[in-house]
């Protein structure tokens, strides 16, 4: 990525909200009783991303409605997933209100997933001469990585973050370039999305086959050379492999647009953001946001790091340690610091 190009961060809103909801204890509530733990975690990650990368613009993409685009190809797509937790569902309108107060564009389109909006903006931004950062926990997004598109991958909770470049994707998949990640999923499938792949072919075998033959198409062309049960499964499930690759391919033609020249961050009103945070009882974060626009009352988090404070642990029977841990949690909440 180049220092001379403008940098834009595109956040997968659904991915980050889900991870925040499960990483932050469900004990945080707005004054009116509405849950806010996912919002608190989302905003912590948002601020750390801003401090680490100092992007020129920020956009958040959300899913909207059922994933019609992929369900038309694969009716059982994500059908096994349970309904969203009501406490998480209730926080989506609230985070969108906060993002609006922050003057952060929200992009979504009926029937399209946030993944495809990230993919579309990645290519549009690249064509506009920008460096793009895609903030998401979904590994299938690695297929979008180029010299000017990196993925900020939230892997465990919100604290374990990797920056995926073409080289790191190649290392992760043992010689597979980003453009071949859909081929990898064509063979391996993706149980979390109900994408079938080929039975019996896991990640190591999928990587090895693609590295050996060069692509899924070439693996299929040489299917007779694949020995044993794996070869039998491959020859019997060629259609599944091709369909799985198609479903796993991130679209770059979602019906969304962004004026990169007119989009910038930070560009928000201190009063509006303070009021929005106050309405949710997240007042401790106000200084951190105000510092982004030169406001008084607190410096930004140290730039360039996603590290979190050391974990405090206390045994259930150790009253003194438990009291100390509770006091530290209370202090961290008051200071607007990360807790998980």
Please place each PLM-identified region on the residue numbering.
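Residue-level marker for well-ordered alpha-helical positions
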Residues: 92-93, 116-119, 203, 271, ...
């Amino acid at each position: 990525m180049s220092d001379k190009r403008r940098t834009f961060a595109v956040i997968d809103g659904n991915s980050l909200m889900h991870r925040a909801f499960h990483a932050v204890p469900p004990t945080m509530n707005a004054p009116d009783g509405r849950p806010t733990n996912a919002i608190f975690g989302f905003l912590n990650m948002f601020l750390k991303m801003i401090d680490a990368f100092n992007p020129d613009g920020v956009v958040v993409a959300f899913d909207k409605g059922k994933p019609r685009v992929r369900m038309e190809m694969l009716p059982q797509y994500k059908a096994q997933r349970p309904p969203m937790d009501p406490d998480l569902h209730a926080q989506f309108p609230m985070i969108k209100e906060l993002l609006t107060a922050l003057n952060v564009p929200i992009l979504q389109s009926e029937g399209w997933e946030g993944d495809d909006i990230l993919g579309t903006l990645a290519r549009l931004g690249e064509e506009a001469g920008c460096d793009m950062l895609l903030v998401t926990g979904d590994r299938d997004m690695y297929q979008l990585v180029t010299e000017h598109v990196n993925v900020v991958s939230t892997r465990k909770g919100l604290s374990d973050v990797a920056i995926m470049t073409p080289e790191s994707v190649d290392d992760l998949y043992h010689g597979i370039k980003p453009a071949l990640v859909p081929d990898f999923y064509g063979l391996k499938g993706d149980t979390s999305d109900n994408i079938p792949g080929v039975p019996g072919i896991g990640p190591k075998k999928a990587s090895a086959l693609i590295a050996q033959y060069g692509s899924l198409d070439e693996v299929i062309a040489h299917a007779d050379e694949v020995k044993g049960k794996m070869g039998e499964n491959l020859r019997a499930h060629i259609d599944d492999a091709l369909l799985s690759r198609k479903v796993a391919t991130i679209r770059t033609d979602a019906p969304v647009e962004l004026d990169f020249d007119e989009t910038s961050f930070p560009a928000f009103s201190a009063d509006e953001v303070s009021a929005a945070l106050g309405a949710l009882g997240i007042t401790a974060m106000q200084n951190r946001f105000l510092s982004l626009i030169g406001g008084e009352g607190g410096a930004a988090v140290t730039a360039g790091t996603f590290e979190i404070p050391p974990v405090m642990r206390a045994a259930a029977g150790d009253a003194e340690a438990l009291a100390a841990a509770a006091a530290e949690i209370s202090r961290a909440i008051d200071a607007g610091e990360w807790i998980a």
